[in-house]
Amino acid sequence: MKLHEHQAKTIFADAGIPVPDSRLATTVDEALDAVDEIGYPAAIKAQVHVGGRGKAGGIKIATDRDEAEQYAEEILGMDLKGYTVDQILVEQGVDFVDELYVGVTMDRGEGQPVLMVSTEGGVNIEEVAEENPDAIAREHVDPAFGLHPYQARKVVYEAGVDADVALDVASILTTLYDLYEENDASEIEVNPVMITSDRDVIAADAVMNIDEDALFRHPDLAEMAEESYEDDLERKAGEYGFDYVRLSGNVGIIGNGAGLVMTTLDLVDYYGGKPANFLDIGGGAKAERVTKALDMVFSDENVDAVVFNIFGGITRGDEVAKGINEALEQFDEIPKKVVVRLAGTNAEEGMEILNTDLVEVEETLEDAVQRAVKNAEEVTQ
């Protein structure tokens, strides 16, 4: 579960991490009331779960009331990488002289949490990791012993952080690790940490992702879950128990098993398409769940074509086929072309059940993906 920036900053502030004064607004009038209280300059920030908000026009700095009104009007309701902005954070501007990145995530290769610090703050850290990996200092933490204070100081100094603010940055990093551990987070970061001319250290942004399977241990975070969903599709996925991630492409993808869905995503990209989503219906999916999955994908206006990839183990091909037929029979006109590939348990029975007037059937995954990509291209031409 991804927390919004304002939610994560509330948690950070409660833990003692310095954050700018801010107010949440859902209307232009609320935004103007907020800047009247906070003063100028003020950052007007879209609250959506996407990276690169600034480059996409989702963050603006207002220096007076007219600009604040203009930017609030522009950002509220805008489409930001497929998400509609319905709330903004109005935040006190920070006069900074330097920017850093600090974060904690799980290194799955090592099976341990890893602290990360870089003086390349304020930019996409994934790009830094790819283009200049040495610019990120790392320190693994043995979960059996926890974080030792010297480890935070060590990784901060190794990153080349100025000595006069290094201890303050190490303190923020230590607190982030504590929050990471206490809240069953999968990722927590600040990008950027801003250093002011007075050498104050301020968390100007906040990212905090929580393991949804651990929410039963955190009722306070569970209460944030409803607000953290960006749209009805994510909300539906949570209700249905699907693993769902919305992407920016136009080829809808449904499968059973995370690995199978990821393989399908890779093939869509390989054959020149753009995946619109990751949707795993899980093992043993009955017709009802398949119907719900198709309904979800059809509801995404960005989807132009759908590929359904099922390998039967626990999931029976005949049940999946029934679900596909039931879902498609609900429509007077099929809204998107659907390509189906079935293999494994009861796959032959499933292929016979499928109504080929409603779907296109392919025997191999490669053929199914190529047809779906072609179908999507035909819609956009």
Swiss-Prot record:
Positions with a binding annotation for substrate: N256, G313, I314, T315
InterPro entries linked: ATP-grasp (IPR011761), ATP-grasp_succ-CoA_synth-type (IPR013650), ATP_grasp_subdomain_1 (IPR013815), Succ-CoA_synthase_bsu_CS (IPR017866), SUCC_ACL_C (IPR005811), Succ_CoA_ligase-like_bsu (IPR005809), Succinyl-CoA_synth-like (IPR016102)
Record-level Gene Ontology MF annotations: ATP binding; magnesium ion binding; succinate-CoA ligase (ADP-forming) activity; succinate-CoA ligase (GDP-forming) activity
Catalytic activity: succinate + ATP + CoA = succinyl-CoA + ADP + phosphate; GTP + succinate + CoA = succinyl-CoA + GDP + phosphate
Stored PROSITE patterns: ATP_GRASP, SUCCINYL_COA_LIG_3
Domain ATP-grasp: 9-236
Domain of life per record: Archaea
One biological process term in Gene Ontology: tricarboxylic acid cycle
The record's free-text note on cofactor binding: Binds 1 Mg(2+) ion per subunit.
UniProt pathway: Carbohydrate metabolism; tricarboxylic acid cycle; succinate from succinyl-CoA (ligase route): step 1/1
Major enzyme class: ligase
NCBIfam families: PRK00696.1, sucCoAbeta
PANTHER family assigned to the protein according to its UniProt record, in alphabetical order: SUCCINATE--COA LIGASE [GDP-FORMING] SUBUNIT BETA, MITOCHONDRIAL, SUCCINYL-COA SYNTHETASE BETA CHAIN
Subunit structure: Heterotetramer of two alpha and two beta subunits.
Family classification: Belongs to the succinate/malate CoA ligase beta subunit family.
Protein name from the UniProt record: Succinate--CoA ligase [ADP-forming] subunit beta
Organism: Halorubrum lacusprofundi (strain ATCC 49239 / DSM 5036 / JCM 8891 / ACAM 34)
UniProt gene name: sucC
